């Protein structure tokens, strides 16, 4: 049987062209031939050339590790801040060794007075750690592999913390089951006392973890901590929960309550000052009386003809159920009738604090009786009829 014939006129030139292409590609190291050669037959069969991409053996680790603010950058900024603070202290005639941040702020306000309403737009000179945000250090090695197994979750610190908290929950539940099996478990020791403290808010937790969290993530974490705090905890678990609690100071304790004073007749009295808008008031509240109130030597019914102003004066006594038990003498100046009534009410409320308990003082603070009203009259705007009112627009 005769061998199959091959048309050399067409096959040879193409074979030479392909051989040259394969040999050139082998030199470049980019192409590989999957067979030893070309097959001859009725039709020339050409094997497909496979492309294998070149693998980069050296990685630009510096580019992968690029940080917004490096450690060297922060150190340089701190050095410049310390030098600038010493120069500022010398300019103000102060001792550079005892020049505090409060002195720096006061000096900047004096040297660079600004009338800008937005405080963030005013000139400042703060420590670099307060100016530049915290950032996470590099989380992978020279080979490009991350150190933490939760790196690819995008929130490795958050999920690691959730794992740790849930592990403590399981440990506390196991200990609770053991106590219940021995008959030593009591409901009184079930929960941890959290009075006087609060959980970290979302922004504080983000600053601690140096990660952005969603509201759902934050709520889930707080629910897990509340579940842990409801279980009988040992010292280590209480310390873990305490890391995410902040002590809340009772606001009423910040107010300085003056002790009671006594006059020549031995009657107890207390004084208080109040202010609202441009009105200033001073009140003297006596311990025993019939409910008589004098303002600048005039009875309050004659001084304030408007019922609303009278109700403002009587509200502190009505709130404490002390109507008709105290006599009050007030002096007030400046402002209008409404602002004078507010200033007198604040002065009387502060004076009453000397006659009541700490709990009642806290109730008054929560009711707003011990808080100064910061509202003032809004200034007129140029090009307008008033603070908000515009001129009447006329087409013609």
From Swiss-Prot:
GO function terms (MF aspect): RNA binding; structural constituent of ribosome
Location of the protein in the cell: Mitochondrion
Sequence segments annotated as region (Disordered): 374-396
UniProt keyword terms in alphabetical order: Mitochondrion, Ribonucleoprotein, Ribosomal protein, Transit peptide
Protein family membership: Belongs to the universal ribosomal protein uS9 family.
Subunit structure: Component of the mitochondrial ribosome small subunit (28S) which comprises a 12S rRNA and about 30 distinct proteins.
The protein's name in its UniProt record: Small ribosomal subunit protein uS9m
